[in-house]
């Protein structure tokens, strides 16, 4: 309990530090651009994320999602009268979800786990093991935004496509069986660092003044790259052979999908 509390406290401190860094960056850029005739606009987003994962292997079943947060700087670069390019720099926290592995095996052979027995042998993880993936990314999204004419103070928009380059900064996993639960295990070495997300979204910009606008929208993005290394194996019990497990290399494809409630402000 004490260990988990300390881990949560450290994570909160890191999160607060990153929020402050992003805030300072946005304010510095805004101050600089105020003297440049606002060639482009910048802002800040803090957007809740409903994240889930899926797998092309029928024996690896999605078993719940995660509630996360995207936090970072956004920019709007005019292109034509009713369209613009967008560019950002985000931290994405707690993306991922949970898989139920109907067939156990050694799925985390390279991770820095607290108990070596969790990655020793052909089948350290039993049938029905659940692994919750908690992923933190540094993201660089770029998109093309189309706007309607302003009606009152509101302007509606469609942003598509949105292509996001993502780099894994942190990977944690909760391992759950009938006999034990291991939380916040370091599983980054069994995960793929780069990813690419393809998405789109729509929403509304509400002008509070000539230069300041609130933004609210709904976005969806899908990861195009398998986020697991696939260095592990599944193991089916077979008492007629020695050793008593029939192993198969894990070649499944696991991807992330995010539904994002985009909340931001442009200056």
PLM feature spans:
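Predominantly the C-terminal beta-signal and adjacent terminal strand-loop region
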Residues: 195-200, 205-267
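Short glycine/proline- and aromatic-enriched beta-strand/turn motifs that initiate or cap beta-hairpins
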Residues: 34-76, 253, 258-260, 264-267
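Flexible, surface-exposed loop regions and adjacent strand-edge segments
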Residues: 58-63, 102-111, 173-182, 231-240
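Residues on the lipid-exposed face of transmembrane beta-strands in outer-membrane beta-barrel proteins
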Residues: 44-48, 69-77, 89-91, 140-146, ...
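Outer-envelope beta-barrel architecture signal
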Residues: 36-42, 81-85, 138, 152-156, ...
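Glycine- and aromatic-enriched membrane insertion/assembly motifs of diderm outer-membrane
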Residues: 61-123, 136-138, 267
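Short sequence motifs at beta-strands and strand-loop junctions characteristic
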Residues: 63-68, 130-137, 188-197, 251-257
